[in-house]
Amino acid sequence: MRKGVHPKNNLVVFKDGSNGAMFLTRSTLNSKETIKYTDGKEYPLITVEITSRSHPFYTGQQKFVDAAGRIDKFNKRYKKS
């Protein structure tokens, strides 16, 4: 592999802005802001708006839209006679 072509991959902490959950993972992102993680080491901190810990799809708290009512209304309106 050529040197200097690939981005630097390092450990960073991603923090969910809505509920405070934190994940330690590898990323090419970097930040000047740091945080001390549960293992006692300091890592760059990336704050994100939403993660799998707070997204309604993954938490099971999603709301289903009444699509059936809309489909029936559409079919009634544009039904071929």
Curated annotation (Swiss-Prot):
<comment type="subunit">
    <text>Part of the 50S ribosomal subunit.</text>
</comment>
<dbReference type="GO" id="GO:0003735">
    <property type="term" value="F:structural constituent of ribosome"/>
</dbReference>
<keyword id="KW-0687">Ribonucleoprotein</keyword>
<dbReference type="InterPro" id="IPR042105">
    <property type="entry name" value="Ribosomal_bL31_sf"/>
</dbReference>
<dbReference type="GO" id="GO:0005840">
    <property type="term" value="C:ribosome"/>
</dbReference>
<dbReference type="InterPro" id="IPR027493">
    <property type="entry name" value="Ribosomal_bL31_B"/>
</dbReference>
<keyword id="KW-0689">Ribosomal protein</keyword>
<dbReference type="Pfam" id="PF01197">
    <property type="entry name" value="Ribosomal_L31"/>
</dbReference>
<dbReference type="GO" id="GO:1990904">
    <property type="term" value="C:ribonucleoprotein complex"/>
</dbReference>
<dbReference type="InterPro" id="IPR034704">
    <property type="entry name" value="Ribosomal_bL28/bL31-like_sf"/>
</dbReference>
<protein>
    <recommendedName>
        <fullName>Large ribosomal subunit protein bL31B</fullName>
    </recommendedName>
</protein>
<comment type="similarity">
    <text>Belongs to the bacterial ribosomal protein bL31 family. Type B subfamily.</text>
</comment>
<dbReference type="InterPro" id="IPR002150">
    <property type="entry name" value="Ribosomal_bL31"/>
</dbReference>
<dbReference type="GO" id="GO:0006412">
    <property type="term" value="P:translation"/>
</dbReference>
